[in-house]
């Protein structure tokens, strides 16, 4: 099993690479790429950790060597948010980065499962899809927007609010991966009830959690460590699915035939072909239904922005 991380010298990329080095199955290969010249050194640093995961690092303009034979590609390359920016402000720089990297994936590892971490995810996933279509290798079951950070934040905040063991808390999150498009389905959390005020407050906190981190870091970065953990969880789930493990379910932003938008985050079953099944997200509360319907114009505009960028 070979996993490639593109953007591996950045804050998310280094955190993700560390976690994958310690958690990938024995015998796996971890391939790190970044434009930054430090990247081979990051690989050497990680190679001193005593796990049976082989690490190689590649730097420069061309990621081809890092991508050869990759089963999973996780893309975190791009610029990070600064105070006063929202995820859409990142578009002008990150759109081109994602386009160029996915073009290389299409040429080098067209069957790989691709997880897009680079923001704005609502738009960058649409860019990736158009690039893969243009290359004639698009498979909607092999492209994912990684929204796992919204899920782990939801689990953490619900557990804190209700005094629960966070390991027992499961919160599906649907929609997209920015602002109002992030919709935690708190009505589906088992064994706990919320007042209307709690639902509104928790939903808003989950939607704005990225900004909470950006502001707390006072210009020194965005959510890199928690995002690294979220991306590792999702990447390991992709690997487990590829290895044939049953009942691997994660929420992800996919082209899954949703009635709501071309791309929509919802629970999916992961397997040897990527998405094996898109699961219905089930019954929602009136609050959630209203929030879902209210987000759709924003989500569809984000998607169209990505389509138009490639055309």
From Swiss-Prot:
Record's GO cellular component terms: cytoplasm
Record keyword Ribonucleoprotein present: no
Active site: 177 (proton acceptor)
SUPFAM superfamilies: LDH C-terminal domain-like, NAD(P)-binding Rossmann-fold domains
Catalytic activity: (S)-malate + NAD(+) = oxaloacetate + NADH + H(+)
This protein's record includes keyword Transcription: no
Entry function: Catalyzes the reversible oxidation of malate to oxaloacetate.
Protein name according to UniProt: Malate dehydrogenase
Biological classification of the source: Bacteria, Pseudomonadati, Pseudomonadota, Gammaproteobacteria, Alteromonadales
